[in-house]
Amino acid sequence: MLEICLKLVGCKSKKGLSSSSSCYLEEALQRPVASDFEPQGLSEAARWNSKENLLAGPSENDPNLFVALYDFVASGDNTLSITKGEKLRVLGYNHNGEWCEAQTKNGQGWVPSNYITPVNSLEKHSWYHGPVSRNAAEYLLSSGINGSFLVRESESSPGQRSISLRYEGRVYHYRINTASDGKLYVSSESRFNTLAELVHHHSTVADGLITTLHYPAPKRNKPTIYGVSPNYDKWEMERTDITMKHKLGGGQYGEVYEGVWKKYSLTVAVKTLKEDTMEVEEFLKEAAVMKEIKHPNLVQLLGVCTREPPFYIITEFMTYGNLLDYLRECNRQEVSAVVLLYMATQISSAMEYLEKKNFIHRDLAARNCLVGENHLVKVADFGLSRLMTGDTYTAHAGAKFPIKWTAPESLAYNKFSIKSDVWAFGVLLWEIATYGMSPYPGIDLSQVYELLEKDYRMERPEGCPEKVYELMRACWQWNPSDRPSFAEIHQAFETMFQESSISDEVEKELGKRGTRGGAGSMLQAPELPTKTRTCRRAAEQKDAPDTPELLHTKGLGESDALDSEPAVSPLLPRKERGPPDGSLNEDERLLPRDRKTNLFSALIKKKKKMAPTPPKRSSSFREMDGQPDRRGASEDDSRELCNGPPALTSDAAEPTKSPKASNGAGVPNGAFREPGNSGFRSPHMWKKSSTLTGSRLAAAEEESGMSSSKRFLRSCSASCMPHGARDTEWRSVTLPRDLPSAGKQFDSSTFGGHKSEKPALPRKRTSESRSEQVAKSTAMPPPRLVKKNEEAAEEGFKDTESSPGSSPPSLTPKLLRRQVTASPSSGLSHKEEATKGSASGMGTPATAEPAPPSNKVGLSKASSEEMRVRRHKHSSESPGRDKGRLAKLKPAPPPPPACTGKAGKPAQSPSQEAGEAGGPTKTKCTSLAMDAVNTDPTKAGPPGEGLRKPVPPSVPKPQSTAKPPGTPTSPVSTPSTAPAPSPLAGDQQPSSAAFIPLISTRVSLRKTRQPPERIASGTITKGVVLDSTEALCLAISRNSEQMASHSAVLEAGKNLYTFCVSYVDSIQQMRNKFAFREAINKLESNLRELQICPATASSGPAATQDFSKLLSSVKEISDIVRR
């Protein structure tokens, strides 16, 4: 019996038994060898002998002698069956080296080259796995026991080998070093000539390792066979060779079926082309792409049937289907963080290969990755893939792409590159980390671009390690050149957890969350959606873990990938979620979605400063440079704030005022954390996330103001904003349901209309362009253009400037009147006063602030008196219409007139109210708005700021938080009131004075532009826009470079701008709409520069240069319209 056991373990005599071999001997005596009920790994380990092949026989030096690594069954075409461990002699290779002709004792034939290895190579050892990533090694050992190990070569550093050893639930990695004399060692005291000797030594004694090497990890996955035949380029197959079985799903051009290749008894996937489709060329291009790519993590093409329709593409069959469904339905105990990271690593490896081959995928998403045995993942669906001949590929007009996975530059310009695939990989990584959640939950497809434009990014998923989230954020850099390459991403996965394991990191993250849960704020702040109802749903998905049907908001009911994804995603109960917020009872958590109007408000109050920054729904830059707390900010600071960095307030910038700014109270892009905890991302990532606002950091000062805002009014279109104007970015979270009607509803410079008409920006704008957008008006371009002039010289006083150009005439008085209730910047006492006023429903008039005296900044007393005359005259004309609202609204300072909308319509759009006001009233309100710009900033700062923020979404939010349902919301949330503007007054005096001439110009311009203000989007046709472009080109050609040329060109440009803004909603295709918005934005920028030109440039060449830019933008508009 002893002799049998000695033979079993490969020892010649008892003396040859090592301590390790003794262990195997005892196991062999107690159990049968390779019994059927034992796991494969243990049965192999029981037979494994560390001294195997330590001494090479004389025949093993033959270079043509190979050994089989896997079993292979012959299936025609002169192939040869081989069994694992069998020796064979190689006679030659086919044209591409993927098949070799071999001879064994059983005969001669073709075998796959990657199924055999030279008899004297390392691959013959069961413990040597070749090039394997660190993450893959941890995955391969995840089901092992103490002493399970493997030896691998680094994927990123060829030639560098390591030992990966599992012990007590963790995998340890030891680098194998090479001494100067060529010997190998892990511990410098023990050096060896060969790797096999080193492994044998450490199988007997630990000698620096955590434990001895006992059980080699099995090689689970056979390599992919590239092509089922050694014959040259044999892709065309006989249709009769395929037996079609059941349908697996639908693809872009047809359907996918499971089939059997009868010739080889091989299960395959068959993609068919719909007979009535005209996409034959695209379908065949997909097959051509697949012929060129061969990688273990890319789905392999087996053949095509293209002689006659229906056309087939036959690929290898992946057992577990697409990754998206697999993640949603898997056992999360089995598919742990280690497995998820392993999957992500495989995908990055495949994309690195495509990157090197100059291919782009263009549709990278979880739904287009397939899962096989042992969590093998392969990238599939190359229907949109292209071989890159240049740096970018421009898709044809009308091409469809999955918006939520598509990079911004691709949405705006139809241009794709490998960097746009990197963006999609970041979204795919988010899908993996959330077990298949739909990206941007609760956010409409039409809103995604605008959110991204404002640097909004998805929050970090629960339990996601910081390093993984940093990688996601790196993939989501706005500028494509700032994104990493797939080679860098793959390398990052390789080195991401050198000092720890992902399991430890995930447990640490979940532990942090659990600690927060004990403190009552364990909930991760929900994604900020863009609509009132979806905002409430987003809150529910955090508050109701026991109601998975509430998890996905709008994202579940929409087709996120256009035609590529089913319209309805499966419900996803989330795995790791803290208990519901203790402040909400069970009934509240289970309320129907439409009833839960104020849930998010309670969440914000509960978490105070930890609520995530919502995506602003106004113009990308409209409110950014108007942060209320940046009253002392310099012009450079304002520019930095406009260009993407966090919108930190002056308080946040000073640790003494807001220590939380540095210890973790800030919230980057929707992810929330507790004060005192380390941030989710490293400091360098903070610069990339501009959705961290001062309103979050300064929320403590406003707690008293929030005390009366337990619930939001459902009538308010922006129900996600906490009380107080300091929450500037909360104001524009929501959009109207009906996007086409949004433009009509909020037609004049209001958030809704302007947002739907706002040009998309594929690139981040400069600070000036953001400043320009602050008060942009869709219906009154001329005033907005002048507004730019004003802002150019008043950068230092942005917080208190008004924006008549962007304020609807009938909205202007409301802005002035509301200034008292929403000027948190003016001090805590002022905020408390405002809070009391709004909490009481504004039933009684509050003490109005003294009327601002004559303008110290540059207006004469006469002009100031004229202001008052116009105001009183205007208020005398409109009291009858606004009588109902005046009874409820908190009175404004004396100067503001009573030009407001009807009472009881809190969500009414400003443009609608403007329509009710009538022509004369509008003109007077406009005049008032212009005059208000020039009031003394030190004394009329609040009124000025009331004009400064005309964006309606922001408008109703603050006030509605504390008002009873019947109280109308006044669209003024003067967020940027300058309570202490005295330091800036000196700087502003000359700048405002310099713009006195432009004020009068603005008045006349506004009067002339009154009709366009009421233009409905449906009345502007394609022909009107084209005629307007021709008129502008004609004006440019007829005019010389003299000063007089500007007025004519400017007028034609403003007409074109007005028509374009009204026409944008008529464009049905999303891609063209994005491009058209960008073109409108360029046009406006050029017009603004042109208007400034007479005052700032006297040289002809400057004007010529402006004209050339203007012509370029006009041509772009014309091209898009003709498209």
UniProtKB/Swiss-Prot annotation:
Pfam families, sorted: F_actin_bind (PF08919), PK_Tyr_Ser-Thr (PF07714), SH2 (PF00017), SH3_1 (PF00018)
Effect recorded for S229P: Strongly reduced inhibition by GNF-2
Summary of the tissues where the protein is detected: Widely expressed.
GO molecular function: actin filament binding; ATP binding; bubble DNA binding; delta-catenin binding; enzyme activator activity; ephrin receptor binding; four-way junction DNA binding; kinase activity
Gene null: resulting phenotype: Mutants are born with the expected Mendelian frequency, but fail to thrive and most die within three weeks after birth. Most mutants are runted, and have atrophied thymuses with severe thymocyte deficiency. Mutants that survive to weaning age are most often runted, and about half of them show lymphopenia. They display a major reduction in the number of pre-B and immature B-cell classes in bone marrow with a wide variation between individuals, but essentially normal mature B-cell levels. Mutants are highly susceptible to infections.
Residues the record lists as N6-acetyllysine modifications: K710
Modified residues (Phosphoserine): S50, S229, S446, S559, S569, S618, S619, S620, S658, S682, S717, S909, S970
Subunit structure: Interacts with INPPL1/SHIP2. Interacts with SORBS1 following insulin stimulation. Found in a trimolecular complex containing CDK5 and CABLES1. Interacts with CABLES1 and PSTPIP1. Interacts with ZDHHC16. Interacts with the 14-3-3 proteins, YWHAB, YWHAE, YWHAG, YWHAH, SFN and YWHAZ; the interaction with 14-3-3 proteins requires phosphorylation on Thr-734 and sequesters ABL1 into the cytoplasm. Interacts (via SH3 domain) with CASP9; the interaction is direct and increases in the response of cells to genotoxic stress and ABL1/c-Abl activation.
Residues of the SH2 domain: 127-217
UniProt motif Nuclear localization signal 3: location: 761-768
Changes after translation: Acetylated at Lys-710 by EP300 which promotes the cytoplasmic translocation.
PTM annotation (Phosphothreonine): residues: T547, T734, T750, T812, T821, T844
SUPFAM superfamilies reported in the protein's UniProt record: Protein kinase-like (PK-like) (SSF56112), SH2 domain (SSF55550), SH3-domain (SSF50044)
EC numbers for this chain: 2.7.10.2
Natural source organism: Mus musculus
The name this protein goes by in its record: Tyrosine-protein kinase ABL1
Gene: Abl1
Catalytic site: D363
Main location: cytoplasm
